Every structure is written in structure tokens, then in C-alpha cells.
UniProtKB/Swiss-Prot annotation:
Compositionally biased intervals (Low complexity): 528-554, 600-620
Region entry Disordered, spans: 1-30, 47-66, 157-206, 342-396, 527-751, 763-798, 915-992
Entry function: May play a role in the molecular organization of synapses and neuronal cell signaling. Could be an adapter protein linking ion channel to the subsynaptic cytoskeleton. May induce enrichment of PSD-95/SAP90 at the plasma membrane.
Species classification: Eukaryota, Metazoa, Chordata, Craniata, Vertebrata
Source organism (scientific name): Homo sapiens (Human)
Ranges of biased composition (kind: Polar residues): 576-591, 969-978
Biased composition annotated in UniProt, kind: Gly residues: 162-171
Record's bilayer topology term: Peripheral membrane protein
Keywords: Membrane, Methylation, Phosphoprotein
Residues carrying Phosphothreonine: 915
Keyword Membrane listed: yes
Name of this protein: Disks large-associated protein 4
InterPro entries for the chain: SAPAP
Length: 992
């Protein structure tokens, strides 16, 4: 396909166009019947008179207007020096043009419109046909051989030449060409350079480049003409014409590729001018022969690739040469016009365009066409037009390994669907024609071929096993048998062939995948996707593909290496089950689970892409050892195929299990089998979010049984786990509240950490004080176990359960904490001789604490009891309790600050430490005195200094209180807003 290169317009010039006088000396105008409508008018009448030598083809192509040129590679390529290789003197072109009938060119202009519409999307890699563009001489020889084969094998084909009546009649075919030739040449020169530049820029040659030139030749035959007759209406000869043409091609293409040439080794006469070629067929036969040879070039070059990589398939193809011939005949002989053919061979995107003007069959089936079809989905398509030997060999191994069961199944639709996966198996987007087309045509005739090639789930573990060498011989035999049976059925199933879902073969992968899901494909397809995922069946790839048949093909092809094994190092989650041992572990698990589960399977449904992502990327959550024993159906999460929210659908690592799993893993599984897993196991997550409401009644019955101290103990436990220097109430309480189960267990052993916890609690007000140390804190008495939660935190439990029970527990905890502090301070006063100032502070703190407990705490207790009493007339709501509790918090914080100061004093051996404020007071008064000894000013300055210190103290206190109020308000609002899900989720979970 390179031949549409830069110098395409050059061959239109007179200097390069070969002469035709010596070739057509005996005829006046017959050789120039180029119009397809009258191409074969005298074919039978002058069989021997005007022999068209092989090189006559080339001149005719030059004299045709560009729209009717059907052999793209006859155009001189920039790679070739045409003047040296052109065997014809350049002078004769003028005479030929002068002799060309004007009416003929007029008919061309009328009857051969340029249809650019449908073909702009078909772009083929320019570098794909290295063997095709070798040299014009080689091409001419190739065309000669094909033409000789046509006319020697099918002499009866010429009789119907007169029947050609494409769009017009033969009436004035010869009358006004002289005046038009210059215009057509100018149009060609003007139009083709544009296409050439586009082709050069893109590096692809668009089908526009050739099909524009060839559209006329194809369309001129009208809708009734055969697929490849190129304007011939020869009803009687069309089937044999196809058969011979493509018998020639398919029969000999295996021989041509060994020497890397495009010549056909044609048994008929050598390339001398054949006397058997009727000259009047030149115009249209030239087109047809050129098309046939073009296809042959495609086939031979593609097969060259195949042959280089593996000889096994070549052998099987050689054995089934007869099948090739039958297939060529059968596959190309599409009854009716381009419409029916286009519906069969075109992808849905191209069908409209093809309905107007057919595209050459072989081009459609060539790897370049598939490349063009996959161009929009170029993610899957490999860039290189020619497959590397390794990839091609791998493909061969696939074919060999899977062909053993040829003929056992017959589901053409499935087999053709599988072709999408087949095409994705390897990055080679120029697959050899035998590899792609032969299986397709086999499946057309004997649909079992492809379905067997890619439909055997049991073959998967053996894909690259040692058995494939053992099976090669019988595989080739079976392949031959299948091909023969296909050939026998070729004629009978010609019409049926059109009904097969061939578009799936050329359709973009995503379309076929969607169609496969809709069709509910079964396990045979899964095996294909499994194969296509990654040739070496590593367990990870197997598990992935098992559940994600086609989409896994897509992604796996994009990411050529097989899926990475599970990332077990993601997070050391402790447990996923309801009995998770640590709140913090649950929190981390929930966070990661929620995020990842949202990524992979949102809404509990796993479409194939989601499940694919989960199998390839996010498996870290479930694979990180989180798979809960009660929920994970299969123990080894090492190769989890799917990540569901909490459980893993672990794929067994043993191949024997792979087969039964494959049944589950059909595309249906992507919608069905995977779906249950996310729905079963994410259910805890969904429950978590609504659990605060769901568990309300159960909570009342279960929670009161746990002592307050034990709950406070869990507070401290989880706070230890979190180890937050400042008790973020949003963090510690979600941790602390949820674990009635672990409370009784944890209460005893966790007392030692309580000291640090209490320290933090005490220093909550001014956490920044570095002097506070664990040693300075009171011993972990039983009442201290509950004191781990800082005064600000009790509002947070309300987040979990804001009812009378909860607030009563909080109140009792605070009461015990304050009482403990008071008792501790009483002991200290008795044991130590404290200064009056220190003693005053102790008495102040203890008195305020006792006052708070005796008045406000009692009032709040009454409110809680009213809330719990359904008969209470002014029954306070949970909101009321929360608000009152927030007010209590301010008082509790003040008292806590006082006790903090006392503990600082205790750590300092009850020695008062000058605070920075006092130092400021002392330092500030002296400066004003020396400045101005005015009478009143020193006093004023002292007053200012003291006032400034007082203001600073008050402002600091105000800021602190404001910050605390803001924190309490934040806590209060957080408990009532959706942000508090994290707070009550773990608790609700444990209660469940």
C-alpha cells in the first residue's frame, strides 16, 4: 500500500506514461475501451486478435482517469525511480491520449463519481506493504500472471462482456475523449497531490487515496454487479471469475512469500504476452486484474510475516490449500451488490459508506483494515504494522494449542465474537492474512474452527504447556479436516455466510464486548479472554480474566504485561469482620475500604470495567490480608481476582479449579457473579453509614450492661492506639465508643497507658505546656481509668448516641473524674505542707469541681432521666441534652485547667513558678520611671503595665474559651451532620 506515495502525480505526466502503440498496433480503438460499461463488449468476439501483453495493463491504468484506477500500487512510488524502470518509451503516451475517445472519458466523468464519503475513516499503515511496492516491473509481472490465469483458466468468461451495463450504456463510448483528456489529467494532478500530502503527513495512506481512484471502477457496475467484478456485470462468469482469481491468489501465495517477492508463481504460461488474453477486456479486466493482484500482494506479504514466524501454520495452510481456494471463492462471492456485502464485512461504522460503494474484500480483511477499524480504539492496537516474530509466534502457539478441538463446537457467533479477543491477543495490528482471514472464513463455513480455537476453557492451563508440541501434528490434521469440511460446505452456506456476525470481527473491541455482554456469552468466551489476557497463565492474570472476559482483554492488551500480583503490602488491616479487635484498625479499614470500594465497585454493582480495575489495581485492600475469615469464600486472598468491599473473591491458584471457576467467570459474571460479592460484602459499609439509626433500639439494651469505667477505658485504649497528642474529639470518641465487645477485655491491661492519657486530658486546655510529664500525673486508680477522655470529648459520644443513657454515662464519667481529682488534691494537701497560695489554688479547684458536680451535674442528670422517661411532660430531646452538655463542658474545662495547674505545681514540688505574665508585670514598671520622673506619670505607667498584663491575661482566657466553644460547637454540629459517619460507624458495627 506504499504505492500511493509522493510521486503519484508523476506517472500521469507524458514523460513517465508508457507508450501503448507497440502494444496495440493491430487495433484502432479496441484496447481503449476503458469504460467499465463497455469493457467486455468484444471480449468473446476478438479472443485472439488483440492480445494484451502483460505490460499493457500499466499503460491502461495511466490513461484511465484517476477516479477509475483500481490498482493503487501501480502508481509510481517515491521509493522507485520510475523513468529507469519504465519499460516503455515515454513518447507514446501522447499518441495514446490522442486516440482515446472523448466520449469514453466523458462517460468516466459521469459514471465514475468519486465517493469519498465512507472511506475517510479507513486508514492503513503506509509501511505495511513492503513487499508490495517492490517495483513496477514486479507488479506488472504479477498482474500479468494473474491475468493469464484468468483468461487461460476461464476462457468462457469473456462471452458475457457485452452484458456490462453499469450506470450507462455503451452508446457513445468512443466519441469525445480527446477534448477531455487534458482536463482529467489536470484534475488528477490537482486532486492527487492533495491526497498525497495528507498521506505523507500522517504516515498512513488513507483508503481515500486508493478508493477515490478506484471508486469509479467499483461503482460503475451498479448495485447488481458482483463484489470484485469491478464494473463487470458478467452474471454468468462471475462465480468462476472469483473462484479462479482467488484460487490463483490463495493457491500460490504460500510460494510467493519465501523469496519476499510479490510475484505469483503461476503455472500458466510465462510472462510473455499471452495470446489467450482477449484484448477487449483490457479496460475492465485491467481493473479487475489489478484488484486481484492487489489482494494477492496483500496476502502474500501478510503470509510472509506468518511464514517467517512459524512454519506450522504454513503447513496446515498448505494442506488446506483447497480450502483456501474454496474459501476465497466462497468468501468473496457475495451475491448482490455492495450493500449486502458491506453489511457482512464492514463494521457498523462503515456500513453506510459501504452501502454506497463497496470496498475491496481483501482490503477489508487485511490486517491493515482491521488496524484502521481499531484506529479509533487505538489503545488496543499495537503501533507496529508488522508483528514481531515473538508476538507472531505466540499467536501461532495460541492457534496450534487451541486448534485441537476443531470441529467439536459450532457456534459461529461466539467464534466471531472471539475474534475480537483474538485480534487483541497480540500487538501486531498487521496480522498475517492467513492467521486472521483463514480462521474467519473457516468459521464462516465451519463455524467450529474459531469457537474451538478460542472456546475451550480446558485449554487454558495448557496454553503454553509442553503438550502443544505433541499436539501439533494432529492439530494440523484436524485443521485440514476442518478446512475440507468448510470447503464442502462453502457453496451451500454462501448465503448463510452473509448472516454471520462478521461485523464483530472488524468491529472495535469495545462494541463487541458490549454486544457480548448483551448476548450473555458463556464460558467458551471466557477462555478466550483468559488466553488473551496474558499468554503465560499466571494465576493473577487467570483470575482476572476469569471474571472479566472481554474487558479484561481490552485492558490487558493495553497493559501488555499480565496483571501485577496482589499488592499485599498496602495496609496491615487487622480484621474486616464485625468482631474487629481495634477501633483504630476499623477506622483505617473503613476509610480505605470506603474509598477503594467506591473506586472499584460503586453502588455495589461491578461493571466489567470496575471489576477489571479491582482485579488489576485495587486488590490491595482485600489482598492485604484483610479478607475476613467469615466472609471470604476462599481462604487464599493472595491472588484475589476481585476486590469487593470487604470480602475477596479469591481466585484459586491451582489450575484444576480454574475450569469450574470459568463457568462463573463468563461475561455474565461481570454482571452477575461479581455483583453478588460487592453486594454481600459491601453491605457492612452501607450499613455503617445508616447504622446510627438502625441500631438504636438494640443499642439501648446492649450498652447499659457495660460499665462506664469500661467504656472510658476503651476511650483510653483507642486513644493510645491513635496516640494523638491533643485529643481530637472527632477522632478519639469514634474510636472509643464503638467497642462494648472489647471493653471488658481491654479494661484491665490498659491501665499503664492511662497515665499518658490522663496527662493529655489534663493538659487539654493548654496542651502546649512542655512541663507536663507522665510522672507528674496521678497513679492510674480505678477512677482514673475513665478519665482518659478529655473534658471536651464527652460531647463526641453524643455523636454516637445522643440519648439519656449516653449522657448519663458521660456525666458519671466526668463526675468520677472530678471526684478523683478532688480526692487526689485532698491527699496532697494533707501529705505536703503547701504554701497558702498553692493551698488556695487547690481549694479553689476542688471547691469549683464540687460545686459543679453538686449543682449543674445534678440538673443535667435530671434532664437525662426525663429524656429516658417517655411519660415526662417536658421531655427534653437529645438535642437539648447535647446543648446542655456543651455548656457543662465549658465549666468542666475551666476546672480541668485549674487541676492542670495544680499538677504542674506538684511536678514542680509545689513551688510556684513565675509565669511570663508576672515577669512582664515586674519588668515593665521599671522602664517608665527613669524616663520621666514627672509626678503622676510613673503611677500611670505602672497602672498601664498592670492593665496591659491583665488585658493580656483576659484576652488569652477569652481566646481559649472561644476556641473551646468553637470546638464544642464543632463537635455538636459534627455529631448531627453527615460528617459524623466515621464517628458512629465503628460503634454501630460492633453493636451489630
Amino acid at each position: 500500500m506504499k504505492g500511493l506515495g509522493d510521486s503519484r502525480p508523476r506517472h500521469l505526466s507524458d514523460s513517465l506514461d508508457p507508450p501503448h502503440e507497440p502494444l496495440f498496433a493491430g487495433t484502432d480503438r479496441n484496447p481503449y475501451l476503458l469504460s467499465p460499461t463497455e469493457a467486455f463488449a468484444r471480449e468473446a468476439r476478438f479472443p485472439g486478435q488483440n492480445t494484451l501483453p502483460g505490460d499493457g495493463l500499466f499503460p491502461l491504468n495511466n490513461q484511465l482517469p484517476p477516479p477509475s484506477s483500481t490498482f493503487p500500487r501501480i502508481h509510481y512510488n517515491s521509493h522507485f525511480e520510475v523513468p529507469e524502470e519504465s519499460p516503455f518509451p515515454s513518447h507514446a503516451q501522447a499518441t495514446k491520449i490522442n486516440r482515446l475517445p472523448a466520449n469514453l472519458l466523458d462517460q468516466f466523468e459521469k459514471q465514475l463519481p468519486i465517493h469519498r464519503d465512507g472511506f475517510s475513516t479507513l486508514q492503513f499503515p503506509r509501511g505495511e506493504a513492503k513487499a508490495r511496492g517492490e517495483s513496477p516491473g514486479r507488479i506488472r509481472h504479477l498482474v500479468h500472471s494473474v491475468q493469464r490465469l484468468f483468461f487461460t483458466k476461464a476462457p468462457s468468461l469473456e462471452g458475457t462482456a457485452g452484458k456490462v451495463g453499469g450506470n450507462g450504456s455503451k452508446k457513445g463510448g468512443m466519441e469525445d475523449g480527446k477534448g477531455r483528456r487534458a482536463k482529467s489529467k489536470e484534475r488528477a494532478k490537482a486532486g492527487e497531490p492533495k491526497r498525497r500530502s495528507r498521506s505523507n503527513i500522517s504516515g498512513w495512506w488513507s483508503s481515500d487515496d486508493n478508493l477515490d481512484g478506484e471508486a469509479g471502477a467499483f461503482r460503475s457496475s451498479g448495485p447488481a454487479s458482483g463484489l470484485m467484478t469491478l464494473g463487470r456485470q458478467a452474471e454468468r462468469s462471475q462465480p468462476r471469475y472469483f473462484m479462479h482469481a482467488y484460487n490463483t491468489i490463495s493457491g500460490h501465495m504460500l510460494k510467493t512469500t519465501k523469496n519476499n517477492t510479490t510475484e505469483l508463481t503461476a503455472p500458466p504460461p510465462p510472462p510473455a504476452p499471452p495470446a489467450t488474453c482477449p484484448s477487449l477486456g483490457v479496460g475492465t479486466d485491467t481493473n479487475y486484474v489489478k484488484r486481484g493482484s492487489w489482494s494477492t500482494l496483500t496476502l502474500s506479504h501478510a503470509h510472509e510475516v506468518c511464514q517467517k514466524t512459524s512454519a506450522t501454520l504454513d503447513k496446515s495452510l498448505l494442506k488446506s490449500k483447497s480450502c483456501h481456494q474454496g474459501l476465497a471463492y466462497h468468501y468473496l462471492q457475495v451475491p448482490g451488490g455492495g450493500g449486502e456485502w458491506s453489511t457482512t464485512l464492514l463494521s457498523p461504522r462503515e456500513t453506510d459508506a459501504a452501502a454506497e460503494g463497496p470496498i475491496p474484500c481483501r482490503r477489508m480483511r487485511s490486517g491493515s483494515y482491521i488496524k484502521a477499524m481499531g484506529d479509533e480504539d487505538s489503545d488496543e492496537s499495537g503501533g507496529s504494522p508488522k508483528p514481531s516474530p515473538k508476538t507472531a509466534a505466540r499467536r501461532q502457539s495460541y492457534l496450534r494449542a487451541t486448534q485441537q478441538s476443531l470441529g467439536e463446537q459450532s457456534n459461529p457467533r461466539r467464534s466471531l465474537d472471539r475474534l475480537d479477543s483474538v485480534d487483541m491477543l497480540l500487538p501486531s495490528k498487521c496480522p498475517s492474512w492467513e492467521e486472521d482471514y483463514t480462521p474467519v472464513s473457516d468459521s464462516l463455513n465451519d463455524s467450529s474452527c474459531i469457537s474451538q480455537i478460542f472456546g475451550q476453557a480446558s485449554l487454558i492451563p495448557q496454553l503454553f504447556g509442553h503438550e502443544q508440541q505433541v499436539r501439533e501434528a494432529e492439530l494440523s490434521d484436524q485443521y485440514e479436516a476442518a478446512c475440507e469440511s468448510a470447503c464442502s460446505e462453502a457453496e451451500s452456506t454462501a448465503a448463510e455466510t452473509l448472516d454471520l456476525p462478521l461485523p464483530s470481527y472488524f468491529r472495535s473491541r469495545s462494541h463487541s464486548y458490549l454486544r457480548a455482554i448483551q448476548a450473555g456469552c458463556s464460558q467458551e468466551e471466557d477462555s478466550v479472554s483468559l488466553q488473551s489476557l496474558s499468554p503465560p497463565p499466571s494465576t493473577g492474570s487467570l483470575s482476572n480474566s476469569r471474571t472479566l472476559p472481554s474487558s479484561s482483554c481490552l485492558v490487558a492488551y493495553k497493559k501488555t504485561p499480565p496483571p501485577v500480583p496482589p499488592r499485599t503490602t498496602s495496609k496491615p488491616f487487622i480484621s474486616v469482620t464485625v468482631q474487629s479487635s481495634t477501633e483504630s484498625a476499623q477506622d483505617t479499614y473503613l476509610d480505605s475500604q470506603d474509598h477503594k470500594s467506591e473506586v472499584t465497585s460503586q453502588s455495589g454493582l461491578s461493571n466489567s470495567s470496575d471489576s477489571l480495575d479491582s482485579s488489576t489495581r485495587p486488590p490491595s485492600v482485600t489482598r492485604g490480608g484483610v479478607a475476613p475469615a467469615p466472609e471470604a469464600p476462599e481462604p487464599p486472598p493472595k491472588h484475589a481476582a476481585l476486590k469487593s468491599e470487604q470480602g475477596t473473591l479469591t481466585s484459586s491458584e491451582s489450575h484444576p479449579e480454574a475450569a469450574p471457576k470459568r463457568k462463573l467467570s463468563s461475561i455474565g459474571i461481570q454482571v452477575d457473579c461479581i455483583q453478588p460479592v460487592p453486594k454481600e460484602e459491601p453491605s457492612p459499609a452501607t450499613k455503617f453509614q445508616s447504622i446510627g439509626v438502625q441500631v438504636e433500639d438494640d443499642w439501648r439494651s446492649s450498652v447499659p450492661s457495660h460499665s462506664m469505667s469500661s467504656r472510658r477505658d476503651t476511650d483510653s485504649d483507642t486513644q493510645d492506639a491513635n496516640d494523638s497528642s491533643c485529643k481530637s474529639s472527632e477522632r478519639s470518641l469514634p474510636d472509643c465508643t464503638p467497642h462494648p465487645n472489647s471493653i471488658s477485655i481491654d479494661a484491665g491491661p490498659r491501665q499503664a497507658p492511662k497515665i499518658a492519657q490522663i496527662k493529655r486530658n489534663l493538659s487539654y486546655g493548654d496542651n502546649s505546656d512542655p512541663a507536663l510529664e507522665a510522672s507528674s500525673l496521678p497513679p492510674p486508680d480505678p477512677w482514673l481509668e475513665t478519665s482518659s477522655s478529655s473534658p471536651a470529648e464527652p460531647a463526641q459520644p453524643g455523636a454516637c448516641r445522643r440519648d439519656g443513657y449516653w449522657f448519663l454515662k458521660l456525666l458519671q464519667a466526668e463526675t468520677e473524674r472530678l471526684e478523683g481529682w478532688c480526692c487526689q488534691m485532698d491527699k496532697e494537701t494533707k501529705e505536703n505542707n503547701l504554701s497558702e497560695e498553692v493551698l488556695g489554688k487547690v481549694l479553689s479547684a476542688v471547691g469549683s469541681a464540687q460545686l459543679l458536680m453538686s449543682q449543674k451535674f445534678q440538673q443535667f442528670r435530671g434532664l437525662c432521666e426525663q429524656n429516658l422517661n417517655p411519660d415526662a411532660n417536658p421531655r427534653p430531646t437529645a438535642q437539648d441534652l447535647a446543648g446542655f452538655w456543651d455548656l457543662l463542658q465549658l465549666s468542666i474545662e475551666d476546672i480541668s485547667m485549674k487541676f492542670d495547674e495544680l499538677y504542674h505545681l506538684k511536678a514542680n514540688s509545689w513551688q510556684l513558678v513565675e509565669t511570663p505574665e508576672k515577669r512582664k508585670e515586674e519588668k515593665k514598671p521599671p522602664p517608665p520611671v527613669p524616663k520621666k520622673p514627672a509626678k503622676s506619670k510613673p503611677a500611670v505607667s505602672r497602672d498601664k503595665a498592670s492593665d496591659a498584663s491583665d488585658k493580656q491575661r483576659q484576652e488569652a482566657r477569652k481566646r481559649l474559651l472561644a476556641a473551646k466553644r468553637a470546638a464544642s460547637v464543632r463537635q455538636n454540629s459534627a455529631t448531627e451532620s453527615a460528617d459524623s459517619i466515621e464517628i458512629y460507624v465503628p460503634e454501630a458495627q460492633t453493636r451489630l
